[in-house]
From Swiss-Prot:
Protein name: 2-hydroxy-6-oxononadienedioate/2-hydroxy-6-oxononatrienedioate hydrolase 1
InterPro entries: AB_hydrolase_1, AB_hydrolase_fold, MhpC_alpha/beta_hydrolase
Known function: Catalyzes the cleavage of the C5-C6 bond of 2-hydroxy-6-oxononadienedioate and 2-hydroxy-6-oxononatrienedioate, a dienol ring fission product of the bacterial meta-cleavage pathway for degradation of phenylpropionic acid.
Gene3D superfamilies: alpha/beta hydrolase
UniProt KW keywords: Aromatic hydrocarbons catabolism, Hydrolase, Plasmid
Family: Belongs to the AB hydrolase superfamily. MhpC family.
Cellular component aspect of the GO annotation: cytoplasm
Site (Catalytic role in ketonization of the dienol substrate (substrate destabilization)): 190
Top EC category: hydrolase
Pathway in which this enzyme or protein is active: Aromatic compound metabolism; 3-phenylpropanoate degradation
Amino acid sequence: MTAITEKETSKFVRIQDGDLDLNIHYNDCGEGKETVVMLHGSGPGASGWANFNRNIEPLVNAGFRVILMDCPGWSKSDSIVSTGSRSDLNARVLKGLVDKLDLDKIHILGNSMGGHTAVAFSLTWPERVGKLVLMGGGTGGVSPFVPMPSEGIKLLNGLYREPTIENLKKMMSIFVYDTSDLTEELFQTRLDNMLARKDHLENFTASLAANLKQFPDFGHRLGEINAETLVIWGRNDRFVPLDTGLRLVAGISNSQLHVFNKCGHWAQWEHADTFNRMVLDFLTH
């Protein structure tokens, strides 16, 4: 099978919905009857491709169509200042994308901010959701065990304000449990992605100044989610603590939790092979 590349799968769509008028970038991989939409996190320089490049081909090879959406304010998508709930904003954009692609129902796989977006979408358009996979995100709220904002979120916000290679390395050094995969090439690629869109960095900082609670607490509404849900967490997550994952499975009745030991905030990257097998089994049974 020909390797799937970012360039060959790169596409754009115009989303117009009320006050929204945004050019959104996405990658469209495979031609399966069922579609999995992957949603990235909020780190500077993030993108769907950067977040999930270790997870695309196994799903495509198993017969799924895989869509990687770059949320507004990241990668090649238009920038925006979010003064309200970014979770709801991203969900509206996702709704626009799946409407444009004429997809009646999708499975959603969301990491960190992507998990928040997946929950927001599921609460508003439950009839459009097949199954959910949430990793390192899905609801806000205060941890009873970890002072908030967490160590990782402090470094992330600091990197947005001062996008230097030194601050990037500080953040990414606690992003994962095992730092041996963090090469200088990876650091440089991420830095280049950040600095290529300084408007994204500035607008994220402006968004926090306008509304510090970009990702609201959905805890009181989790019981409304009926979709079968797989929650995946790293025991050593220093961005969003494990007890948040426990809150998700406590609130979503049709859910299960898998915890990776020796794993930080990026389970789909740190434990890719096991993660891919687990997600495929969940989606196909």
